[in-house]
From Swiss-Prot:
Belongs to the adenylyl cyclase class-4/guanylyl cyclase family. It catalyses: ATP = 3',5'-cyclic AMP + diphosphate. Residues 1-19 have a biased composition (Gly residues). Residues 1-63, 235-610, 795-1119 are cytoplasmic. The chain crosses the membrane at residues 64-84, 88-108, 125-145, 158-178, 183-203, 214-234, 611-631, 635-655, 674-694, 725-745, 753-773, 775-794. GO terms for molecular function: adenylate cyclase activity; ATP binding; calcium- and calmodulin-responsive adenylate cyclase activity; calmodulin binding; metal ion binding. Its cofactor is Mg(2+); Mn(2+). Keywords: ATP-binding, Biological rhythms, Calmodulin-binding, cAMP biosynthesis, Cell membrane, Cytoplasm, Deafness, Glycoprotein, Lyase, Magnesium, Manganese, Membrane, Metal-binding, Non-syndromic deafness, Nucleotide-binding, Phosphoprotein, Repeat, Transmembrane, Transmembrane helix. Residues 493-520, 1024-1047 are annotated as: Interaction with calmodulin. Residues 1-28 are annotated as: Disordered. It is an enzyme of class 4 (lyase). Its EC number is 4.6.1.1. This is Adenylate cyclase type 1.
Length: 1119
């Protein structure tokens, strides 16, 4: 269709973005001129819509030209056969010419490569030829008035001559031709006015009779034009609505696709692709299994680097929260860049400890060289910073080459990690190293092939673990200062005297923020930012772009459509083939081959059904006026007309009430179909009643007659006369009475075509049985079979239109439904990715980044005044961990650790522990915190006791969980817990692989509470005891304990919970008996047997012993 709503889609689907005030005002001024010829204000969007409707418009044009060709051909054939008729007019001999013209346009239109401009030109030519055809059908009498005898060459021109041809052409131009709405309306008005004017001036007749006939003709023209305008406007509005709905779904789909790409990139930045995709699939569709799935891979030839910033603790303690996060992000952001340059993968950041692996995701033969280069670059970076600020900062680096197991453990807050004895040794190498030196083992040295100068490292003199295992170490000797980072003008920033920590910290932050030196990215900024401006514009929310989905307003201007969305739709339209889409429909019934889709299609509400009934009521009123003007009065017809009008009024009232009351399902497809059929039959019965009253039923057997016609043998034959002079108008009313079928859009074409067949058959039977064709139609028309040709052509046009509308609506729905399904799929993917994202970051942190503007994104950090921090370690897990061929070099040991951590994670799924946030796992150490949800300071102070109580209960229940695992797995693991409370800083650092963490003295002390604690006990600080002493817990004072960096600290053991009377109801201790509680998650893992005696912890283990490389030292790095 051509004309279209301006900036919206009728009744729904949304319009677009409102323009400025000036453009809106201009649109309002033009509204009066363009109300019936609506289109999108955006030319690009309008062109898309034209392309969207091209094939359907081409099919409609073919149908229109076929009907017009049949019409002109039938009239030409009648002329060729020399059928008697009225006096010769201007149309004499023009019908064959018009038939040829319409057929020529039909051939041109059938060209597959026809484009929108060519189709519009074909439609305009067809309309022009239709206009000349209609004008020539007007009653222009060239032969003068009749000589009083029907036997003359022709009778006088009549007022009814050419009316049915004009009615048919007018309807076809509205319903099927691809011309603008204003052009179609103008055509209809010109045709009607021309016929009325010619009739009034050229047709000889008695004035009273002529004016009544002109009035009846005018009413019929009004009815056809009214129906045509309704069909044209609402058909196009519904199509534009479907187009905008599909576009909205595609827009949402693209927006969701971009969001999913961001989330996918985030996921890929945190985990290797192969691990991430496998975990994602299992996370969304958890397989049924007894054990939790472990995501561990083995790599036999890699190099591991551990690095620690020496002197960072004192500097960080003087920083504000924002400065600390900036410090960490700038430093580790630079380290991430260096890691990428040197083909290393950063694994984790632990306080100020940074470790990475080379040769992990992509095997490399020079992985040892890469790690050495990485270590030297890190030292150069810190050296540059130290020289610029005169702060005593340095880097201690340790390397080892060997085997690792990499992957993730647990069910929540996944973090990629590596485990093995070789990882532990690399960590020990860092601890035993010296500032400014790269400390390597003999194994790594052998992989360097003599490419670096080395010197003895004497690591065994500084570390007992190296001495015990007789490990020889070396230092890399750099030949010269390898990298001087530009952007540091030392003379401008070196102070004359030593600066205070606060000044140094501020200067360091500003210095590292210099883009020339450190191009550290904001975490998530590379993930959350789109690639180009067009893409960003296309990602605006649908509520901003499509504001009027429930109403079709012509004054809404679509000013700034998403260019990217339009380009995507354009590509879809290029690939779209209507024939391929028709494959989803049954060719004869046009039903969807998928039953479910057919059912959903029938559930759509017909928003124009009430309007169609109102229009039918108006048509009934027009029939009443025509009846009163020219038909003889009949009680039966009058009663039928009154009943028809009353029934239609009742239908309108019923539909209005149900719409106001919002009765669900009150107008199903079955009810709509039955009402449509009954209404059409009823309105048609009124016209058929007029026909019956005007036909010669009572005189068909009488010999007396005043009418003389020529028989086929050339003899004059006397035939009976008709009982009224308005037979032709009765037949015209029958033709117009079938038009209501065209305005019930949501009624399927099959029942319409069946009904049309019945009405046409009854029409022909009435004419044949009445003797009308044998009388030759009396004085009305000399062409006895012309009414039959008229009803057949009308029925053909209505059937083709019904099928075209049905195809159009079904294909529109199919395209919109497919777009909606894709959008829903992407929405599901988005929700799934968001679930995974919330499993990687705390919910409030993830939401912060999802809602942030990528252009203005800043570092995320948050200061908390009171947070409970817990470290829970299994110190004797290192005795269990062993690397043998029989356990796949330690994989089976990690499988059991995964079960333990997963069961701890499952505890957090309880609603009681919803405030606890898992931070990470460090080897066999589990770190969690409570009170990190953003709250006001007052609320935080009031709730800290309850928060700590929740954390304490969680720690107590962790002992129960570990006891059950011990019972089921023949082990005797022992838990050791430390809890502290105080201020912390939370934030996200690391641009390439963002990581959420918490820092502060509170975290360090909580780690020391674990490392200095006693196995099987929960050690807490004095502050925790003070906050929980009024709660139902039993505490035992341990006394003062020496804590690194803090001196002597008074600590307490939390022994368990007590009831209201002080009786201990839940205790902790090494001597307690382990009792199976029968948790469902652990049943069936192992047959219940008596646990083995506890394994004692070996004395003299280093801070990072085999199997758990970071429970105490690295975990307790001061932030």
């Amino acid at each position: 269709m051509a004309g279209a709503p301006r900036g919206g889609g009728g009744g729904g689907g949304g319009a677009g973005e409102p323009g400025g005030a000036e453009r809106a005002a201009g649109t309002s001024r033009r509204r009066g001129l363009r109300a019936c010829d609506e289109e999108f204000a955006c030319p690009e969007l309008e062109a898309l819509f034209r392309g969207y409707t091209l094939r359907l418009e081409q099919a409609a044009t073919l149908k229109a030209l076929a009907v017009l060709s049949l019409l002109a051909g039938a009239l030409a054939l009648a002329e060729l056969l020399g059928a008697p008729g009225p006096a010769p007019g201007l149309a004499k001999g023009s019908h064959p010419v018009h038939c040829v013209l319409f057929l020529a346009l039909l051939v041109v239109t059938n060209v597959r490569s026809l484009q929108v401009p060519q189709l519009q030109q074909v439609g305009q030519l067809a309309l022009l030829f239709s206009l000349t055809f209609a004008l020539l059908c007007c009653p222009f009498a060239l032969g003068g008035p009749a000589r009083g005898s029907a036997g003359a060459a022709g009778g006088p021109a009549t007022a009814e001559q050419g009316v049915w041809q004009l009615l048919l052409v007018t309807f076809v131009s509205y319903a099927l031709l691809p011309v603008r709405s204003l052009l179609a309306i103008g055509f209809g008005l010109v045709v009607a006015a021309s016929h009325l004017l010619v009739t009034a001036t050229l047709v000889p007749a008695k004035r009273p009779r002529l004016w009544r006939t002109l009035g009846a003709n005018a009413l019929l023209f009004v009815g056809v034009n009214m129906y045509g305008v309704f069909v044209r406007i609402l058909t196009e509005r519904s199509q534009r609505k479907a187009f905008l709905q599909a576009r909205s779904c595609i827009e949402d789909r693209l927006r969701l696709e971009d969001e999913n790409e961001k989330q996918e990139r985030l996921l890929m930045s945190l985990l290797p692709r192969n691990v991430a995709m496998e975990m994602k699939e299992d996370f969304l569709k958890p397989p049924e299994r007894i054990f939790h799935k472990i995501y561990i891979q083995r790599h036999d030839n890699v190099s591991i680097l551990f690095a620690d910033i020496v002197g960072f603790t004192g500097l960080a303690s003087q920083c504000t929260a924002q400065e600390l996060v900036k410090l960490l992000n700038e430093l580790f952001g630079k380290f991430d860049e260096l890691a990428t340059e040197n083909h290393c993968r950063r694994i984790k950041i632990l306080g100020d400890c940074y470790y990475c692996v080379s040769g992990l995701t992509q095997p490399k033969t020079d992985h040892a060289h890469c790690c050495v280069e990485m270590g030297l670059d890190m030292i150069d970076t810190i050296t540059s910073v130290a020289e610029a600020t005169e702060v005593d900062l340095n880097m201690r680096v340790g390397l080892h080459t060997g085997r690792v197991l990499c992957g993730v453990l647990g069910l929540r807050k996944w973090q990629y990690d590596v485990w093995s004895n070789d990882v532990t040794l690399a960590n020990v190498m860092e601890a035993a190293g010296l500032p400014g030196k790269v400390h390597i083992t003999k194994t790594t040295l052998a992989c360097l092939n003599g490419d670096y100068e080395v010197e003895p490292g004497y690591g065994h003199e500084r570390n007992s673990f190296l001495k015990t295992h007789n490990i020889e170490t070396f230092f890399i000797v750099p030949s010269h200062r390898r990298k001087i980072f530009p952007g540091l003008i030392l003379s401008d920033i070196k102070p004359a005297k030593r600066m205070k920590f606060k000044t140094v910290c501020y200067l360091l932050v500003q210095l590292m923020h210099c883009r020339k030196m450190f191009k550290a990215e904001i975490p998530f900024s590379n993930v959350m930012t789109c690639e180009d401006d067009d893409k960003r514009r296309a990602l605006r929310t649908a509520s901003e772009k499509l504001r009027n989905r429930s109403s079709f307003s012509t004054n809404v201007v679509y000013t700034t459509p998403g260019t990217r969305v339009n380009r995507y739709i354009s590509r879809l339209l290029e690939a779209r083939q209507t024939e391929l889409e028709m494959a989803d429909l049954n060719f004869f019934t046009l039903k969807y081959k998928h039953v479910e889709r057919e059912q959903k299609y029938h559930q759509l509400q017909d928003e124009y059904f009430t309007s169609a009934v109102v229009l039918t009521l108006i048509l009934a009123a027009l029939f009443g006026l025509v009846y009163l003007l020219i038909f003889p009065q009949s009680v039966v017809v009058l009663l039928l007309l009154v009943f028809c009008i009353c029934f239609l009024v009742a239908c309108v009232l019923y539909l209005h009430i149900t719409r106001v009351q919002c009765f669900p399902g009150c107008l199903t497809i079955q009810i709509r179909t039955v009402l449509c059929i009954f209404i059409v039959v009823l309105i048609y019965s009124v016209a058929q009643g007029c026909v019956v009253g005007c036909l010669p039923w009572a005189w068909s057997s009488k010999p007396n007659s005043s009418l003389v016609v020529l028989s086929s043998g050339g003899q004059r034959t006397a035939l009976p006369t008709l009982p009224c002079e308005s037979t032709h108008h009765a037949l015209l009313c029958c033709l117009v009475g079938t038009l209501p079928l065209a305005i019930f859009f949501r009624v399927s074409s099959l029942p319409k075509m069946i009904l049309l067949s019945g009405l046409t058959t009854s029409y022909i039977l009435v004419l044949e049985l009445s003797g009308y064709t044998r009388t030759g139609g009396g004085a009305v028309s000399g062409r006895s079979y012309e009414p039959i040709v008229a009803i057949l052509l009308f029925s053909c046009a209505l059937a083709l239109h019904a099928r075209q509308v049905d195809i159009r609506l079904r294909l529109d729905y199919l395209w919109a439904a497919q777009a909606e399904e894709e959008r829903e799929d992407m929405e599901k993917v988005k929700l799934d990715n968001r679930r995974i994202l919330f499993n990687l970051l705390p919910a409030h942190v993830a939401q912060h980044f999802l809602m942030s503007n990528p252009r203005n994104m800043d570092l995320y950090y948050q200061s908390y005044s009171q947070v409970g921090v817990m470290f829970a370690s299994i110190p004797n897990f290192n005795d269990f961990y062993i690397e043998l061929d029989g356990n796949n070099m330690g994989v089976e040991c990690l499988r059991l650790l995964n079960e333990i951590i997963a069961d701890f994670d499952e505890l957090m799924e309880k609603d009681f522990y919803k405030d606890i946030e898992k931070i990470k796992t460090i080897g066999s150490t589990y770190m969690a915190a409570v009170g990190l949800a953003p709250t006001s300071g007052t609320k935080a102070k009031k709730s800290i006791s309850s928060h700590l109580s929740t954390l304490a209960d969680f720690a107590i229940e962790m002992f129960d969980v570990l006891d059950e695992i011990n019972y089921q797995s023949y082990n005797d693991f022992v838990l050791r817990v430390g809890i502290n409370v105080g201020p912390v800083v939370a934030g996200v650092i690391g641009a390439r692989r963002p990581q959420y963490d918490i820092w502060g003295n509170t975290v360090n002390v909580a780690s020391r509470m674990d490392s200095t604690g006693v196995q099987g006990r929960i050690q807490v600080t004095e502050e925790v005891h003070r906050l929980l002493r009024r709660c139902p817990y039993h505490f035992v004072c341990r006394g003062k304990v020496s804590v690194k960096g803090k001196g002597e600290m008074l600590t307490y053991f939390l022994e368990g919970r007590t009831d209201g009377n002080g009786s201990q109801i839940r205790s902790l201790g090494l001597d307690r008996k382990m009792c199976p509680f029968g948790r469902a998650g652990l049943q069936g893992r192992r047959p219940p047997v008596c646990p083995m005696p506890g394994v004692s912890v070996r004395a003299g283990l280093p801070p990072h012993s085999p199997g758990q490389y970071l429970p105490s030292a690295a975990a307790g790095k001061e932030a």
